[in-house]
Amino acid sequence: MDINITLIGQMITFAIFVGFTMKFVWPPLRKALDERREKIAEGLASADRASRELEVAKRQSAEILREAKAKATEIVENAYVRAHKVDEQAKEEAIAAADKIKSMAMAEIEQEKVKAKEELKHEVVSLAMAAASKIISANVDEQSSKKILKDFVEKV
């Protein structure tokens, strides 16, 4: 093996080249690779975070939708109950008003009935008095009395 000056010169030049590359070229290259690695890691972490946030948002939106449906159902049921109560109340009020009108009509009928009885009583009394006075005033026999009473009964 012949080692000559050229080979030594090439070795020295190669060593200087390696030293120069290690000192000036490798650090910026390494820095660029590290930055690229960090950006990729951040992108993956961000995508993972976004995926988790999306799942949370989906669950929250599903929960909100479920609550909204439950609330809507409750509102509809409350409206139905309220409408039913209003309907029942209106029916009860109508029945009460009808009962009141009926009782007032019955009371009025009863008053008219009492009034008619009183008028009839007064008329019967006056007719009886008239018949009695005719019987007394007329010196009549039994047949005449019967005829007067028969006429009186027909009038009544």
Curated annotation (Swiss-Prot):
Q: List the disulfide bonds.
A: none
Main role?
F(1)F(0) ATP synthase produces ATP from ADP in the presence of a proton or sodium gradient. F-type ATPases consist of two structural domains, F(1) containing the extramembraneous catalytic core and F(0) containing the membrane proton channel, linked together by a central stalk and a peripheral stalk. During catalysis, ATP synthesis in the catalytic domain of F(1) is coupled via a rotary mechanism of the central stalk subunits to proton translocation.
Q: Give the UniProt family note.
A: Belongs to the ATPase B chain family.
Q: Which HAMAP family match?
A: ATP_synth_b_bprime
Q: Locate the transmembrane regions by residue number.
A: 5-27
Read off the lineage from the record: Bacteria, Pseudomonadati, Pseudomonadota, Gammaproteobacteria, Thiotrichales
Q: What is this protein called?
A: ATP synthase subunit b
Q: Which InterPro entries match?
A: ATP_synth_B-like_membr_sf (IPR028987), ATP_synth_b/b'su_bac/chlpt (IPR002146), ATP_synth_F0_bsu_bac (IPR005864), ATP_synthase_B_chain (IPR050059)
User: Subunit structure of this entry?
Assistant: F-type ATPases have 2 components, F(1) - the catalytic core - and F(0) - the membrane proton channel. F(1) has five subunits: alpha(3), beta(3), gamma(1), delta(1), epsilon(1). F(0) has three main subunits: a(1), b(2) and c(10-14). The alpha and beta chains form an alternating ring which encloses part of the gamma chain. F(1) is attached to F(0) by a central stalk formed by the gamma and epsilon chains, while a peripheral stalk is formed by the delta and b chains.
Q: Name one GO cellular component term.
A: plasma membrane
Entry superkingdom: Bacteria
State the species of origin. Francisella philomiragia subsp. philomiragia (strain ATCC 25017 / CCUG 19701 / FSC 153 / O#319-036)
Q: Which Gene Ontology molecular function entries are recorded, alphabetically?
A: proton-transporting ATP synthase activity, rotational mechanism; proton-transporting ATPase activity, rotational mechanism
Membrane-topology annotation of the record: Single-pass membrane protein
Say if the entry is tagged with keyword Acetylation: no
Subcellular location as annotated? Cell inner membrane
Q: Principal place where this protein is found?
A: membrane
Q: Gene3D superfamilies, per this entry?
A: 6.10.250.1580
Keywords annotated in UniProt: ATP synthesis, Cell inner membrane, Cell membrane, CF(0), Hydrogen ion transport, Ion transport, Membrane, Transmembrane, Transmembrane helix, Transport
